[in-house]
C-alpha cells in the first residue's frame, strides 16, 4: 500500500493549498498504483491542477480518470467534466478557438445531463451559463431557453438557492430589455426584488424602464 502513503501526503499538502507540491506526490501515487485499482488518485490530481487554473492538464487527467472507470462513470462525473470545460473556456489562458471548443464540449455534456435527468435543474442551469458565455452580449439570447427551464425547476424547490434564481431572472430581465419588451423585463426585475428587496441591479433596471 505504498500508494496510500503517497496519496495521503499529497492530500495533506493540498489541504494546505500547496497544490504544486501535492501534484508531485499524487503523480508518484499514480505510478505506485500499478494495478490501476484506484482511479480516484487521477481525479484528485486533476483537481489539484484545476486549483492552479491549469485547465488543459486538469481536463487531460480527468479524461484519463473517466477511461479508468471503464464505462462506470456516474452522471456526476460527467457533470464535473462539463464544469471543467466551462472553467477552461473562461480562463485567461484560452484563446478564442480554444474557448469555442471548450464551450461546445461543455454544452454537449450539459445537454446530455438535462436529457438524462430532466427533473434536475443543474443540466439546464450550466447549459445556460455556457451559452451565456458564448453569447456574452446576450444579443442572440442563446441562454434564454435554458435559464427558463432551470428557473421553472428552481421555483418548485422549497430550498432553492436565491442566488441561482436571481441569476436566471437577471438574465431574462436583461434579455427582454434588449428586445424592448419592457413590460416582460419588469416582471423579472420585480421578481428579484421580491426575493432580495435591496438588489441594486434590479432597482437600477426598474428606474431605467
Q: Which residues make up each language-model segment?
A:
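Eukaryotic acidic, Ser/Thr-rich intrinsically disordered low-complexity regions
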Residues: 192-193, 199-209
